[in-house]
């Protein structure tokens, strides 16, 4: 409470927003509040990005798994935020990161996963901001094994390479 009182009394005025926790979400919330002209204080118990943010996967994903649940609004929002980070807010801290989806079922898997990733890419391209990452690509068994030689060739029919993004969140919050 002493820290919060000190943060609010520095200027002698009441705060519009007090954000507790200076991880990636808290810092982003404070930045958003300040950019809207609100008087804002950000307090952290330890160091910036030292809590949950320090133990995250660092992924900035577009919500691919939510396509299967037909939550298109959430996917659209996540893709727009990813594109905004990649192209406007922090292109120096956010970078595309490739993923390899191994295909093991002969008949249905490639068209099913491929259609989902095509929709994912299309939603990213028609969003408010640029996609920011390369489009997905279908690979043969040989192409997949070139990228990931430890995959079991006897179980593999091919793969699909797609992209999301990764952020240096400790630098993003400071």
Model-derived features: where do they sit?
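Extreme N-terminal leader/targeting segments of oxidoreductases
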Residues: 1-17, 32-36
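Beta-strand elements within well-structured catalytic alpha/beta cores of enzymes
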Residues: 18-20, 41
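Glycine-rich Rossmann-fold phosphate-binding loop(s) that bind the pyrophosphate
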Residues: 22-23, 45
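N-terminal Rossmann-fold NAD(P) dinucleotide-binding loop
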Residues: 26-27
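Glycine-rich FAD pyrophosphate-binding loop
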Residues: 34-55
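Dinucleotide-binding Rossmann-like beta1-alpha1 core, especially the glycine-rich loop
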Residues: 58-147
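Helix-loop-beta segment of a Rossmann-like dinucleotide-binding subdomain
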Residues: 125-135, 145-174
């Amino acid at each position: 409470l002493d820290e919060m009182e000190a943060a609010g009394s520095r200027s002698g005025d009441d705060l519009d927003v007090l954000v507790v926790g200076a991880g990636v979400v808290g810092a982003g919330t404070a930045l958003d509040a300040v950019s809207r002209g609100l008087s804002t204080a950000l307090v952290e118990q330890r160091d910036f990005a030292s809590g949950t943010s320090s133990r995250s996967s660092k992924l900035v994903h577009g919500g691919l798994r939510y396509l299967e649940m037909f939550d298109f609004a959430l996917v659209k929002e996540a893709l727009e935020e990813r594109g905004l980070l990649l192209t406007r807010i922090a292109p120096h801290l956010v970078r595309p990161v490739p993923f390899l989806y191994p295909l093991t079922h002969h008949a249905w898997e490639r068209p099913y996963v491929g259609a989902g990733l095509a929709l994912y890419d299309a939603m990213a391209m028609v969003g408010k901001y640029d996609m920011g990452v390369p489009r997905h690509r279908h690979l043969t068994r040989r192409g997949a094994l070139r990228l990931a030689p430890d995959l079991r060739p006897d179980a593999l029919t091919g793969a699909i390479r797609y992209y999301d993004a990764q952020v240096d969140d400790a630098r993003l919050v400071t």
